[in-house]
Amino acid sequence: MRRVGSAVALVAVLLSMLLASLLIWPRSGTVVPADAVVVPSGDPGARLERALQLMARNVAPTLVLDGTPDFARVDELCRGGVAFEVVCLRPEPDSTRNEARALGRLGKDRGWRRVILVTSSVHVSRAGLLFRRCFKGEVVTVGVAVLRSVGIRDAVRALAHEAGGLAHGSVVRRC
């Protein structure tokens, strides 16, 4: 009985370490020139700021945003008037998978070979998985730390959502 308890504890620790490596400390790619910088939906906050920093460094000529009309800065960028092209997507229903599908179509139409996906660090693994399935070029992921700026309840909720989404994305293998 004692061995079973030890084995269960070991599995729990290993699973926790795996989830932490995938959701809390995911790998981000090296930022290199690309065809577009992409910011998926959700509260854009720090992700949008990081994307705008990349655009200011001229790493890509196009910024792709989820055009959800709930965020003033996103609305402003979608109206244009900036030094780079902004493409605003509105996939229905709004989901990471549908955003990845929309980007896949857009990238195919435009002949893109590489995009930089800027999202929260907790979302990098799942979003990267889905965008790589739907976009036929290279997807470089850039994670932005956001869990430090939210409460414990929201952080746990976000981690649980991403863990479930990552499990679903691993089972449902289509774009």
Per-region residue spans from a language model:
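Structural signal for membrane-spanning alpha-helices in multi-pass inner-membrane proteins
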Residues: L19-I24, G169-R173
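N-terminal Lys/Arg-rich, disordered targeting/topogenic segments
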Residues: M1-R2
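A transmembrane-helix-recognition feature enriched in membrane-embedded lipid enzymes
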Residues: G151-C175
